[in-house]
């Protein structure tokens, strides 16, 4: 069903859900409009009320806070929707940056817009775009991915799915997983250009620019602290063409043997070769085992 929202000229019996960005490190990045909105709404739904309370104290915001995070989003979200339906205005904030981006909030936005509610976004701080524009890597087109899976095996699967994308790719990463993630990127994406940023907008803001292998060298020698944003160069046409054609001169048997030489079992190698060739595994299996 089509739903039209005239944010400032429309009429609605329900309240408005405001999506209010908060600073990603430097408190001076809080906008006048964000402060005014947080002061004027009936309640602030916060990912971490303790963190938001500190922000409110700085700007003398006395609006009541309600907890809304990943572990209570269903129960708290239902309560917030009921408040909105009754005509109350609610502001949604995350700990830092824009709500719903690698943070809870997308569900409540969908639920409220599905019933015709007005959702008004405010512009403001965002770590991904802040890192991108200063990365030195082509800023557009870009693809924002956020956090990779914490499990090493699943992380590699995700990178495999991303390796042919030609857009600049933006990731978030925690300090204790940075080295493992960089190693997985080097293995799967190759030695591309990358900009690693940490402590954006804070006193110790830092950019580390270079190839993935160079950044791995830095990570092995430096102390890893802070929250990281990684801006990675996309694939180029030559890389894609080379990847698609490298095996074309090989027989199916030689193709399987190539993967076995890289450490794969015969079963894994047959599966990989079948995927490359876009043929049934049985066809590759038969070709590999002939005359053996």
Swiss-Prot record:
GO molecular function, one term: rRNA (cytosine-2'-O-)-methyltransferase activity
Protein localization: Cytoplasm
First-level EC class: transferase
Keywords in alphabetical order: Cytoplasm, Methyltransferase, rRNA processing, S-adenosyl-L-methionine, Transferase
Gene Ontology CC, one term: cytoplasm
PROSITE patterns: RSMI
Reaction equations catalysed: cytidine(1402) in 16S rRNA + S-adenosyl-L-methionine = 2'-O-methylcytidine(1402) in 16S rRNA + S-adenosyl-L-homocysteine + H(+)
E.C. code: 2.1.1.198
Presence of keyword Transmembrane: no
InterPro entries per record: 4pyrrol_Mease, 4pyrrol_Methylase_sf, 4pyrrole_Mease_sub1, 4pyrrole_Mease_sub2, rRNA_ssu_MeTfrase_I, SAM_MeTrfase_RsmI_CS
Domain of life: Bacteria
SUPFAM superfamilies on file: Tetrapyrrole methylase
Function: Catalyzes the 2'-O-methylation of the ribose of cytidine 1402 (C1402) in 16S rRNA.
PANTHER family: RIBOSOMAL RNA SMALL SUBUNIT METHYLTRANSFERASE I (PTHR46111:SF1)
Similarity remark: Belongs to the methyltransferase superfamily. RsmI family.
Protein name per UniProt: Ribosomal RNA small subunit methyltransferase I
Organism per entry: Bacillus subtilis (strain 168)
